């Protein structure tokens, strides 16, 4: 740095190496954060969908049995009241996740909401991707909670 004409080749290469290392670690951290946000948003949107089904069952005094439809890598949650056999369409009784990398790995087969006394068949739905897992837990009284893997207290 004592030369009059600028930086030496070694100084430039060291600066470039530091810049590349910081950029690579920042890119990895950003991708991990983005994947974890997509997982959380999918679980939250599924919770909102189930809240809608619970309120609809109570308001119209009808039952909503939830099932999953898989079409290749695409999956969706469908209410029995929708009468749909596909993930395509714009029915509010069908939930299609925005991001295909979020998987639904487990669903209680008899998960349902009943209009009579606003009750539910207890169960859970598990969402996962490369960053972790979220559980959507339904109680017999229709309470919905989001729990992260390994979390025993403080479910949302």
UniProtKB/Swiss-Prot annotation:
Q: Which residues carry this modification: N-methyltyrosine?
A: 7
Kindly indicate whether the keyword Membrane belongs to this entry. yes
GO CC annotations, alphabetized:
membrane
Q: Which residues cross the membrane?
A: 7-29
Q: What does this protein do?
A: Not yet known.
Q: Coding gene?
A: ppdA
Which NCBIfam families is this protein grouped with? IV_pilin_GFxxxE (TIGR02532), PRK10506.1 (NF007800)
Q: Does the keyword Plastid apply?
A: no
Cite the entry's keywords alphabetically: Membrane, Methylation, Transmembrane, Transmembrane helix
In terms of superkingdom, the source organism counts as Bacteria
Write down the SUPFAM superfamilies for this protein, in alphabetical order. Pili subunits
**Residue ranges listed under propeptide:** 1-6
Q: Organism, per UniProt?
A: Escherichia coli (strain K12)
Membrane topology note: Single-pass membrane protein
Its name, as the record gives it, is Prepilin peptidase-dependent protein A
Pfam families according to UniProt: N_methyl
The listed locations are:
Membrane
Tell me where it mainly resides. Answer: membrane
């Amino acid at each position: 740095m004592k030369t009059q004409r600028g930086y030496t080749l070694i100084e430039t290469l060291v600066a470039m190496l530091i810049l590349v290392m910081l950029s690579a670690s920042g890119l990895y951290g950003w991708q991990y954060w983005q994947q974890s946000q997509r997982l959380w948003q999918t679980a939250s949107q599924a919770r909102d969908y189930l809240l809608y089904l619970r309120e609809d069952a109570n308001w119209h005094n009808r039952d909503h049995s939830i099932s999953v439809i898989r079409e290749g890598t695409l999956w969706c949650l469908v209410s029995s009241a929708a009468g749909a056999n596909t993930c395509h369409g714009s029915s509010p009784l069908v939930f299609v996740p925005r991001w295909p990398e979020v998987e639904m790995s487990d669903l209680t087969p008899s998960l349902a909401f009943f209009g009579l006394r606003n009750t539910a068949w207890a169960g859970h739905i598990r969402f996962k991707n490369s960053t972790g897992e979220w559980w959507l837990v339904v109680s017999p009284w229709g309470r919905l909670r989001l729990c992260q893997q390994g979390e025993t207290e403080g479910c949302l």
